[in-house]
Amino acid sequence: TLPPSNVTELLAWIRANKDKATYGHAGVGSASHLCMLMLMKEIGVQMNGVPYRGTGPAMNDLLGGQFDLMCDQTTNTTGQIQSGKVKAYAVTSKKRVPSLKDLPTLHESGLKDFEVSVWHGLYAPKGTPKPIVDQLSASLRVALKDPAVMQRFADLGTGPEPADRATP
């Protein structure tokens, strides 16, 4: 566990320890990797990155103290944050996450232009017949009207985009 207790202290710690501080990520080009690259650019430091084959192995090593910090999606980390297994400093979205309501945004914490948000998609192979894609879309719309599904999304700190931004 790092000594800082808030984002301001964390950024000061990173700057003071930039030559030895390490971060883990879910793989080169992953959201967690890009988030850390953007953060380092924003605060003007370079740290050593440790790539993993997914969030699971990275989270295991974060919990085991193999590296110092990590940026990842709330869908992957909310359980560990709520259980107190990891210390969270902020969310990178524009708005606070309802399931982590006491966690500030980086914007609130002084990084005014910093935002990282991710999205998840449902995919089918190229050439999937239109009736199958249409049925999949219709089933997804039905699922998104289910209060239990929406509550689970909220519990994980995520939610669907407005319908006008969806594609079949």
Q: Which sequence ranges carry the predicted segments?
A:
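Hinge/capping helix and adjacent helix->loop/strand transition within the periplasmic-binding protein
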Residues: 1-57, 106, 119-152
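Conserved functional loop/turn residues at catalytic and ligand-binding sites
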Residues: 6, 51, 65-66, 73, ...
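Short, high-confidence coil segments that cap the C-terminus of an alpha-helix
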Residues: 18-19, 62, 67, 86
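Hydrophobic residues within well-ordered alpha-helices
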Residues: 36, 61-63, 81-84, 136
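A ligand-binding cleft/hinge motif common to bilobed small-molecule-binding domains
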Residues: 40-42, 69-103
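Short helix-initiation/N-cap motifs at beta->coil->alpha
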Residues: 50-60, 64, 73-76, 166
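Periplasmic-binding protein-like
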Residues: 90-126, 156, 162-164
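Mature extracytoplasmic/periplasmic domains
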Residues: 134, 150-168
